[in-house]
Design a protein with these regions (language model features):
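Short alpha-helix capping/helix-loop boundary micro-motifs
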Residues: 69, 114-117
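Polar/charged, compositionally biased leader and regulatory segments
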Residues: 1-53, 60
Length: 166
């Protein structure tokens, strides 16, 4: 069969939009639960109403996250399914991964090394995202730990309200 002549071809207009095909939609709410990223104990609890003592810094201040004890090299697991939004390095919390878990909620994991995820990657709950590493100088007296922060629309939320009881 001969190829159609240009005059016989139909014009097709494609809108200037990127359509995400088969991209999961994540949902998180006040009724959702989070898996513990590591098995350790809480070293420094969440408190935005009162100050708590930070041994290394020798100061009292609010804490927008929880700091969970860990062993160096221990796998750090994703607490919920989501998409990796950002990977960055912070003087206080070291290498960190921010994961959007849906409906304006984000989880930040800090004090990581040997990351196993990349930006824009979709991850399931329980997936290894990295490994606990020696703490930054801001947490040297607290020891090796994982910094674990939950945000809703950019504001810190107490992750203990969502973590599944051990």
């Amino acid at each position: 069969t001969p190829a159609p002549k240009e005059s016989e071809m139909a014009a097709v207009t494609v809108p200037d939009e990127t359509i995400a095909v088969n991209s999961p939609v994540y949902s998180f709410s006040e009724k959702s639960s989070l898996l513990w990223p590591v098995e350790g104990d809480i070293i420094l609890g969440y408190n935005m109403d009162k100050t708590i003592y930070f041994p290394t810094l020798d100061i009292y201040r609010c804490n927008p996250a929880v700091v969970i004890s860990a062993e160096a090299g221990e796998p750090v697991l994703s607490s919920a399914p989501g998409v990796v939004e950002e990977i960055y390095t912070d003087n206080e919390i070291g290498t960190a991964v921010k994961v959007s878990v849906g409906d304006g909620y984000e989880v930040i994991y800090g004090q990581l090394s040997n990351l196993q995820v990349g930006v824009s990657e979709h991850i399931e709950a329980g997936r290894v995202i990295g490994y606990a590493t020696e703490p930054t100088k801001y947490y040297s007296k607290e020891g090796t730990n994982v910094y674990f922060k939950l945000l809703k629309e950019g504001a810190a939320v107490d992750p203990m309200l969502y973590l599944i009881e051990k």
